[in-house]
Amino acid sequence: MTISHIDPEYQANTIEPSVQQDWENRKVFKVADTVEGKHRYILSMFPYPSGKLHMGHVRNYTIGDVISRFYRLKGETVLQPMGWDAFGLPAENAAIAHKVAPAKWTFENIAYMRDQLKKLGLSVDWDREFATCTPEYYHWEQWLFVQLYKKGLIYRKLSTVNWDPVDQTVLANEQVENGRGWRSGALVEKRDIPMYYFRITDYAQELLDDLDTLQDGWPQQVLTMQRNWIGRSTGMEITFPSANTEIYADGLTVYTTRADTLMGVTYVAVAAEHPLALKAAENNPELAAFIEECRMGSVAEADLATAEKKGMATGLFVKHPVTGEELPVWIANYVLMSYGSGAVMAVPAHDERDFEFANKFNLPIKQVIDAKGADDADYSATEWQEWYGSKEGKLVNSGEFDGLEFQAAFDAFLAKLEPQGLANSKVQFRLRDWGVSRQRYWGCPIPMINCDTCGQVTVPEDQLPVVLPTDVVPDGSGNPLNKMPEFYETKCPCCGGDARRETDTLDTFVESSWYYARYASPDFTGGMVKPEAAKNWLPVNQYIGGVEHAILHLLYARFFHKLMRDEGVVQGNEPFTNLLTQGMVLADTFYREAENGKKTWFNPADIELERDEKGRIISAKYSGDGQEVIIGGQEKMSKSKNNGIDPQAIIDQYGADTARVFMMFAAPPDQSLEWSDAGVEGANRFLKRVWRLVASFLEKGNSATAIDKANLSKDAQDLRRKTHETIQKVSDDIERRHAFNTAIAALMELLNASNKFEAKDDNDVAVEREAITTLLTLLAPFAPHLSQTLLAQFGTDLTEATFPEVDASALTRNTQTIVVQVNGKLRGKLEVSVDISKDELLAQAKALPEVQQFLTGPTKKEIVVPNKLVNLVV
């Protein structure tokens, strides 16, 4: 083989564009819908086309690309696709601000970001790219909606919702933060509007059970979060008969997981929207006003738990199902109409919220559990916390039920009340049905028609997709579709009469709940996904994304997979076999604070820093005026803190390979990564050293390739051992541990060993060549442009290269390093044969000149730790 020559200096900006062009010309990452042999589907969560990449994107997609390239080297066919989560509020709001159609804004952003992603060197099959805002995509989302509506898995109901008055849309509970909209920051109101819901609760048990099948592939933290969100509980429904049958004939039914505390109920609380509350308020203006006040508050559980407890007595009473005692009914702002029956039995002595409420409104507090085991223990406000929530104690102050523990009490109350029709055992879930209607324009049209005669009617399948007009420029005043008769005026498919098309659009979580399946056959026109392609590629082998998606996106995608399975679209029960949740990217923050407390944030690129000898920042000045700014510490890169680092600037200055290596080396993937300019420079220096090593080797012009294993020098044996140990470690670090940082550290060690090695004959040259080509191949998942360019000098095309095999014989050691101590202190080292005898080892240790000077007195003890050390005690 002829050895080539290369420029002595690494020029990323020269080599990277040509390598990327080569990949594109040869379509080396294109895969078929069905393939033979070993294959794998690696997917990073697709981006929202916000306008430009941020470092979180770079980290996410580099992780996916490292894994993809690794398995290609292992001989597998790998599908790694890319697309765009293109509907949603930000596009609409940007369109309002810039007076441009969201479609135009979105597709311009996609074009720019696609170019950025390609410059990162991702091994993506770009022929599978799609945007979720195209009719070709959402056609099949609408098709599924129609099927599910016909099966009763989607329904429409009037709902009290969180209404964001600025964004003019409904917010999920999770999108309300401290009573304000997560995006606009506006105070959230409550409104009653008709909405479409997915019956995700029909799948609650299966969604919970199937988490067990993900035990080996998903982070424990995510599984726990999903279990808690689904929130299965086994409890009892108990009915409290009405004491005011002339006003409210029905009793109040409550759900409780603590039926054992029934004898401690001192009042019953209902939600403001409960029918009993509304009945009581009919002739009570004060109560009606209070109900309205509650309605205007948040409906998010977290907010209700921490909000000030507010309440008002309805003047109505119910009877205790065991004693017949009359208990007052209160309206309480901490009771949710959407959970259980909208009513709770209040046991202030054994529930934190009830306790707080009872203290505020001077309601009785009756202890019925004694956690200490003393039957005569009286309730004490100071001791209350000790047995709040305890299931260990026995019942007290509970009449015939005294002395029973939790399960026995549960069974006894059920046995007493169930024959009277006042109780039954029930499993309940915290999970609520998924409201998907959004009162915005830039989303997938809901394929429903409202007819005065026929009610809600699905759009016929041959009329799908219902296409969203794309030439609309929203002005911010509600949904523009409501002002477009050309969109909403239609005929009823049932009676042929005039009808109105639904103008609400779908929650954008719907698009991201099935996109992974569409990638298997993005051009398929006969359904959501081609059956044989789904069978070939699904489920996704490795999914990568931020832990902030642990609950909603991942739960909805799991739900959709089951919906599609039940429609015969896909097989299997779960969409993602393995999940990697990467940590955030942090960067330094700098600001100035005005007298009114308002902070102005400065981008790190505009700051001149002074550091101490340990590299810590001791002063920072804004380059615009030379004046000092306050150092705010490291926080997640964000627009609000203006501390984002533009990936394009890093690529322009250092190249994509440097950005990739830094991102993978700076921290384990599941932990936060602290941005460091010095770290980027360090990654770049590493790649320059690799380049110089290869340039130096090629310069010598020796083409020896055959290794004579039987006649290796000790230095050559050491380098071969290091080479094959590195193969072993990098393989394990990438495949099993996802410890990309330690894989790169191992490559740095191999680089150092190769640099120190001095070849003295052809055998040495062949060993050095093996080390260098191995280094380049193992580095390829991290720095593919550099690796492809340099491997070509050795006659290897990276796109056809294979992961090096470990030579077990190279790992065996003929010699070992032994530490020699005198009285426990290091005095010398020996390089000896691995099968040296104990006597010979001691003799060589004592013969070391640097040891002999300390052997002045008689030797009391000779300690030999095999393969490690000799300690001579004198």
Swiss-Prot record:
ATP binds at residue 639. This is Leucine--tRNA ligase. It is found in: Cytoplasm. Gene3D superfamilies: 2.20.28.290, 3.10.20.590, HUPs (3.40.50.620), Isoleucyl-tRNA Synthetase, Domain 1 (1.10.730.10), Valyl/Leucyl/Isoleucyl-tRNA synthetase, editing domain (3.90.740.10). GO terms for biological process: leucyl-tRNA aminoacylation. Transmembrane segments: none annotated. HAMAP family: Leu_tRNA_synth_B (MF_00049_B). It catalyses: tRNA(Leu) + L-leucine + ATP = L-leucyl-tRNA(Leu) + AMP + diphosphate. Belongs to the class-I aminoacyl-tRNA synthetase family. GO terms for cellular component: cytosol. It comes from Acinetobacter baumannii (strain AYE). CDD domains: Anticodon_Ia_Leu_BEm (cd07958), LeuRS_core (cd00812). Its EC number is 6.1.1.4. The keyword tRNA-binding does not apply. Keywords: Aminoacyl-tRNA synthetase, ATP-binding, Cytoplasm, Ligase, Nucleotide-binding, Protein biosynthesis. A motif ('HIGH' region) lies at residues 47-57. A motif ('KMSKS' region) lies at residues 636-640. One of its GO terms (molecular function) is leucine-tRNA ligase activity.
